[in-house]
Amino acid sequence: MVRPLNCIVAVSQNMGIGKNGDFPWPMLRNEFKYFQRMTTTSSVEGKQNLVIMGRKTWFSIPEKNRPLKDRINIVLSRELKEPPQGAHFLAKSLDDALKLIEQPELADKVDMVWIVGGSSVYKEAMNQPGHLRLFVTRIMQEFESDTFFPEIDLEKYKLLPEYPGVLSEVQEEKGIKYKFEVYEKKG
């Protein structure tokens, strides 16, 4: 079964997603709650969502919050020999992770698959064939960053006018405006 892949990211106007292993902007509590809700809520009873992230993204999560709870966590790394403490699975590449999800032990347990970073993992996911959705929080100002989100190819990805459970109006926290967008590529 080929499942749709979902990427979720918050990105500043200059496409920044990280700085020194953290977000370039101050903590936006409601934006974080949106991330938690979207990546955790399964639409199928008895199944869990699964999150895939690179090694640096994993270690950027405060230890007390690892693994991301109520989700199956896969960490990608070519260097690590075993899953980092708290992670459920380790895979060498996104392709390997996607194959792992279709193995009998996981196939029946997984509902939605979410890619949660970082840059190279997003890039690889966005170039995958097939059905992809990008859940993008547009932080409506620039922040100094050292990690960036790949350009969204609007020939392939269509911005959806609305999406269930996603607010369409501009949000504001700590004087920072942002809005939620959903892009889709049918593959």
UniProtKB/Swiss-Prot annotation:
The positions annotated for binding NADP(+) are 10, 16-22, 55-57, 77-79, 117-124
Q: Which residues carry this modification: N6-acetyllysine?
A: 33
Amino acids binding methotrexate: 137
What does the entry list as the binding residues for substrate? Answer: 31-36, 71
According to the record, the signal peptide region is none
Family matches, as InterPro entries = DHFR (IPR012259), DHFR-like_dom_sf (IPR024072), DHFR_CS (IPR017925), DHFR_dom (IPR001796)
Q: Name one GO biological process term.
A: tetrahydrofolate metabolic process
Q: Where is this region: Involved in methotrexate binding?
A: 8-37, 60-70
Question: Where is the protein localized?
Answer: Mitochondrion; Cytoplasm
Assembly behavior: Homodimer.
- The protein's role, per its UniProt record: Key enzyme in folate metabolism. Contributes to the de novo mitochondrial thymidylate biosynthesis pathway. Catalyzes an essential reaction for de novo glycine and purine synthesis, and for DNA precursor synthesis. Binds its own mRNA.
Q: Relay the record's extra comment.
A: Overexpression of the dihydrofolate gene (generally involving gene amplification) results in resistance to the antitumor antifolate drugs methotrexate (MTX) and methasquin.
Name of the protein: Dihydrofolate reductase
Which gene is this protein's source?
A: DHFR
